[in-house]
Amino acid sequence: MLTDRHKEVLKGLLAGILFYLSFSKLNLYFLVFPALFLGIRKNFLRLFSFGFSAFFLSLLWIRIPLIDYGNINPFIAYPALVLLVLFLSLYQFGLTYLLWRVFKFSFFAFPFLYTLVEILRSHLPYGGFPWLLLGVNLVDIPVLRYTLNAGTVFLGSFVVLLISLFPLFNKKEKIFSLAIITPLLIYGFIKETSYRVTHYGLKIALIQPFVPQDVKLNRELFELKYGEIIELVKKAVEKKPDLVVLPESAFPFYLGELEEKGKEILELSKKVPIITGFIEIDEGFKPYNTVVLLKDGRVIEKYRKIKLVPFGEYTPFPFKFFSKYVPYLSFEDYNRGNKVKCFQLNGFSIGTPVCFEVAYPFFVKSFGCEFIAVLTNDAWFRDSEGTFQHMKLARVRAIENEKFFLWVNNTGPSGIISPRGEVIKSIDYGSRGILLFSF
């Protein structure tokens, strides 16, 4: 016989499953609304069960880089994943619940508090984890998606919560909610109906080399792929684009070895400018995740990644201590770049945030360039929910900034994202090829 406590937990788990489906590859984004309506109640058991199951299912893909490529024993990897999910669920849902108690569990206070904690979680600790933000789901909803443009993904999260909890509000709260949502709907309608594609007269080639991560981690195997990558670049150059773009860490040698081992790519850059990712080792033997603009056979500009991935590109304090026991944590920490920049090219400017950096709305906005090319290597996640969630963040950033985004992914998918967040042309996951687009 189910007790009331069991029923609360089960309702929370069901809400968590609906939440996961809204962020899954199935892209059932509309399920976020019933998920929140079912999961958010004054009962902590239901709320925590909702948060834990939602984050656990939605982040289960993290096991792939840990176990398959980090060589971490599953008996260590899965408990580590559970601890991460426990931390995130207590942070997002537990902290919101504690603040909610101060407001005597007013349902109208919940959207404000949850969104406030989302903002906090996106910045702290270790630079934050702006993943699984509720507002992301608006990117597929016409009219409402322009809420993201009006106030970034955080205003989107607030609106998602207002809509989801609307039936639980009293009369005054419903009127106030409508007073917030109605102007945003009008703004979105105006934006949708006045949308026009600007023609820049540019032709861009994106290259998806599809080098699996186990190959990239083996220097000898990766070097065998170099010829295939160069052939793709040659074919792209033959199409006479204004720019060729390759993904993050695209070549099997360091930036400092470019003149010795990358003569072919330098020669090709004399015909067409090339943007590509490299691992760079500085004079102090510290690595950087770097993007370079090659033109006229030399490096014209470079951007060093600023927002590094904790436990992926550096081990934060105090976890370095555990590197003695967990070999995965014993890698050399990457250095951070110190400033964003736009590459100036043929009369237009292009920014190149790398991989995880696309998750940060204000950081991406700070580039201030005419176009954004996100260089990434999602081979770490294969064809998982993580890869889908990552590209969806680029779609959100596109509509926030009302700019074309180029999503250049090693293993795919890669694509062209319009200023209203739509993928207008793409290469599927697992394909090797060239994506040409004129705009």
UniProtKB/Swiss-Prot annotation:
Q: Which InterPro entries match?
A: Apolipo_AcylTrfase, C-N_Hydrolase, C-N_Hydrolase_sf, LNT_N
Q: Which HAMAP family match?
A: Lnt
- Which superkingdom? Bacteria
User: Locate the CN hydrolase domain: which residues?
Assistant: 207-439
Q: Which organism is it from?
A: Aquifex aeolicus (strain VF5)
> What is the protein's name according to its record?
Apolipoprotein N-acyltransferase
Q: Which SUPFAM superfamilies match?
A: Carbon-nitrogen hydrolase (SSF56317)
Record's bilayer topology term: Multi-pass membrane protein
**GO molecular-function annotation terms?**
N-acyltransferase activity
- Name where it's found: Cell inner membrane
Q: Which GO terms describe its cellular component?
A: plasma membrane
